[in-house]
Amino acid sequence: MKNKNILTTILVIALLSIFLIKSTNNNFFKMNSKYKLQSFNLDQDPLKTKIYTLENGLKVFLTEYKNAPRLQTSIAVRAGSKHDPSDATGLAHYLEHMLFKGTNKYGTINFTEEKPLLDKIEDLYEEYRKVPMSNVSEREKIWSKIDSLSNEAAKFAIANEYDKMVSGIGAKGTNAYTSNEKTVYINDIPSNQIEKWLKLESERFRNPIFRLFHTELETVYEEKNRGLDDDGRKLFYEMLDAVFPNHQYGQQTTIGTIKHLKNPSLKEIQKYYDKYYVPNNMAICISGDFESESMIELIDKYFGGFESKEVPNFEVIKERPIEKIIERSVVGPQAERLYIAFRFPGASSKDIHKLRMADMIMSNRTAGLIDLNLNQSQKIIGGGSFPFILEDYSTHVFYGSPKQNQNLNEVRDLLVGQIEELKNGNFPDWLMKAIISDLKLEQIKKYENNQGRANEYVEAFTLGIEWSEYIQMIDEMSKLNKQDIIDFANQYYKDNYAVVYKEQGEDIVEKVTKPNITPVSVNRESKTDFLNSLLAEEVNEIEPVFIDFENDINYGKIDEVPLHYMKNFENQRFELTYVFEAGTNVNPVNKIAFEYLQFLGTDSITSKQKQEILYKLGSEMSFNCSDDQVKINISGLDENFEETVKFLESFLSNFKSDEEALQKLKEDILKKRSDAKLNKQTILFNAMVNFAKYGENSPFTNKLTNEFINNIKSNDLVSKVKDVYASKHIVKYYGPRDISDVEKQLLILHKNKSNLNDIVDAKMFTEIERKTPTVYFLDYDMKQAEVIVISKNEKLNPTLIPISRLHNEYFGGGMSSVMFQELRESQALAYSVYSTFTTPRKINDSHFQLSYIGTQADKLEEAMMGMMNLLNEMPKSEGNLNAAKEGIVQKIRTERITKSAIMNYIERAKKMGLSSDSRKNIFENIENFSMDDVENFHNEKISNQNYTYLVLADKKSINFELLSKYGKVEFLTLEKVFGY
C-alpha cells in the first residue's frame, strides 16, 4: 500500500517569518506561528522525546539518534477506514494513493488548462455513481467520457514527480499506509536534506490535486483483487466482522467494498481531506540525526501556517456483549489455520496493561503457555497469540495450524485449554517478572533503529494516548500480580469469543473487473519549476563512510577458532553466533538435525525447562540451517553473558535424544512441506524461480525424500549435530565487552575450540543454459495472474555492479522507474511491478535478469505485452536518469552500515570475491555513466534474451494460445518444482 496530499495557492517563505497567501481550501493561512514544548519527566523516557505543539495544533515528536546521518519521518493523520462514510468505504485509502499525485505547483505542466478538465472528470464520477450498476450501457457511456477526458487531462500531468523529488534528495522507503484509524506517510531521508523534505511535504499537504485518478483507481482494483486471493487477509477480515457486527472495525475494510470501489467519488474524497487532514489532527514524528531546536523552527516555518479546524467527534458504535461462541469459516487454497478472538476495551482502558501481560503469559516465543504446552510439546503447529489494540475496542487473537491428521476443532480445543490454564493461574510465579525483563530487552532492540522509534510515536498519537502515559506501559505492567491476571482472565475469557476457521477449498468470490482504460501520457521529460527549484537548492554534502574490511572488525582467536568482534557502544545487549559452513548443500540432514535440537532436553532438564531457564535469563537461543551455513546463536543482556554461554555449551554437550519428539517432528516437517505447496509466494519465488535457473536439481529441491525422513533415526541426527559442532567454525560477537574479555571467557567456556574437523565441500548446482524461450505454467486457484520473466547472464562480474545499480534504479527499481511509470501509472496494468538485474552471492553463480508483474488474469495479455516491450526496448529519459544517479549518490553518502551488520556485510562480500566495499566503486563511477552506457547495458544484458516465463494463475482464466506466442508452453506440477 503506498501513496499521496493538503491545500491551494502560494507559499512564500522568509528566513524568520512566514507570510502565507490564503488558499482556496481555507486550511492554509498567515502567520508568525508559535509552538509549545510539552513537559514531562524525561528520566522515564528512554527516547528523551521532545514533544511540541504548534499554535495550529500540529503535534511534533522528536527523538535524536545519531547512529547514521539520516532520519525516519512519519506524518500521521488520525483518520482511517473507520472514518469512511458508510456508503463510500475505501475513501481514506483512496486519498492515501492520491497524495502522491501532486498539487497545483508540481505534478502538472499547466494547471490552468488542466483544472477545468479535472473538474469535469469529478462531475462525471458523480453522474457515474448515481447510475445503477444494472444499467450497464449507461455506465459504459459515462465511463467512456471519463476515460477520454482523463486522457486529455493526463497530457498536462507529470507522473511520479513527488517520487522523483524524494528520490533526488536521497530518500529511502518512501511509502504510505492506511489502517482502521490512521493514515501514515513515511520517508527515510538524509540529515542534510531536512529543509527540502519539509518544503516538499508542506506543499504536498497544502492542496493535493486528484489527477490521474482513473489509472490509480485501477491500481486500487488490483490491490482489492490481491486481497481476495490472500487467505490471511480473508481470515482477518472475517474475524473482525464476527467480533464487531456493528462497529466500523468489522463492517468497513480499509480497501472498501467492491460496490463502493466501482462507484468512487472525488467530491467525497475531497470532503474527507478537508475534514480530517488538518494540523490539529496530524503529527510529524521524526527520529534520527538532527538538532531538535533547529528542527522545530523549520517545522514551524513550513507547517505553522496550516489552519486548524474543528475535527468532528467520532461517534463510537456501542457493541453488545458477545454472549455465545460465534463460529465462521473462510476457504481458500492455502494451508488450514484458525483465529480465536475475544473483544476488549480500547487503548485507553486500564485493563489494556492486563491484556498485554495476559498475552505474554500465553505466548512470548519462549516460555508462554502456548509456547511450552502446545508448540514445544508439538501438539499443534505455529501456535501463538497477539493483542490487536485500537482506540475504541481491542481484540485478543489466538492462532494455530493443525498437525497431520489433526482437524481445526482439535486446534481450537487445545488453544482454549491453555486459556483455561491462564484462568486457573497455572503458570509459574516467576514468569511475570521475566516477562517484564523480556519487554525491556525488546524495547532496547526496537529503539536501536529510527523506524522503531518513530513508529512508537505514531502508535501513541493515533491511539490517542499521551506519550507520558505510553512510556510507562512496562512500569504499569510490572505492578500487576498473579491474582490480578487470574481475576482479569476470569472476567473476560468466557464462551464469548469468535472462532474463524481457514479451510482449504475453492472460494467463489466476485472480483473487481477490469474497466476499459486508454493508456495515458506520463510526460516523463517534463519538470515543474517547483521540482527544479527544490533540487537546485544547495546543501552541505555529507561524505560517505565505507566499510574498511581490515580495520572495521577486530579479529581475535579462541584457541584455533577465529573470533570476529564488534563492540556495542550503545547498550548492554550482546549477540554471540557460532557459524559453520555446513548447510544443506553440505548435507540436507543437517537442517532436520538442528530443528530436532530445539525439542530436546538433557539428563537433568526437560525441553520445557530448557526454555524456562532461557527466559529467566532474558536470553534467546536458536539453531538455524540454511543452504550454506549452520548458525548457533544466543543473545541477551551482558549481565547474563557467562551464564547463557555456559548453558548453551552444557546443552550442546549433554542433549539427549527423544524418540517421541522425533516422531512428532517428522510429522510436522511433512505437514509443513505439504503446506508449502499451497503458498503462492513459495511456489512462484522459490520453487518456480529455482526451476527456471537450475531445472529439477536445485538448491531448493535439495531436500530429503519423505521416505528418508520417515526412516531417519535419532542417532543419525544426534551424530550430525555432534559432527557439525566438532568442525571448523568462526565465532561472531557483538556486545559491550572488550575483545580481550570475550577471548578470555570463551577460552574457558567454549568447549570445541581445537582439533576441529574439516567440513566437506558443498554440493554445486549447475545453472541451465536455455537455448529457446519457454513458458512454464503452474495452475493455482486465484483471481490474479503473476508472471516472472527471467534470463541467465554471465558469471559474477564485479565490474557490472555500478552500472547494474544505476540501471535497476532507472528501469525497474522504484516508483519513479520507467517500468513502474509505464505499466502502473500510464497503463494501469498492475499493482506491483519491478525489474532487477541481480548480483549473485557467490563467485561461480550467474547474474540473472528478473522482472515481475502481478495483474488481473483478464489483463494478462496487455500486461505481458507491456512488460516485454519495455524489456526489449528501454525508453530513454535523461531527466529520470539524472534523478536516479542523484538518488543513488545521496543514499550512499548517508548510508551507514553499523553494529553487527558490518560483520555480515564483510562476510557476504568475501564470498563474492570482493576485498573492499562495492559501494565505493558505485559512488566513484556512477556520475560518469551516460544514457548511452545504460542503453548499451540494457541492450546487451536485458533485451531479446532467451527468456524463461513463469506464470502462476488459474488455468480456467488463461488463454494458452496467447502464452504460446512467447515460447513453448510447459505445464509444471508442484511435485516437479518442489522435488517431493
Please report, for each region that a protein language model flagged, where it lies by residue:
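Charge-rich, well-structured scaffold segments of protease-associated domains
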Residues: 28-29, 53, 64, 111-311, ...
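Active/ligand-binding-proximal structured segments within catalytic/core domains
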Residues: 57, 66-111, 115, 334, ...
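Short strand-connecting beta-turns/loops that link adjacent beta-strands
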Residues: 66-68, 278, 333-334, 392, ...
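Mature N-terminal segment immediately following signal peptide/propeptide cleavage
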Residues: 38-75, 554-570
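N-terminal Sec-pathway targeting helices
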Residues: 1-11
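His/Glu-based metal-binding/catalytic segments typifying zinc-dependent metallopeptidases
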Residues: 225, 241, 312-367, 399, ...
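Bacterial Sec-dependent signal peptides at the C-terminal "C-region" and cleavage site
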Residues: 13-42
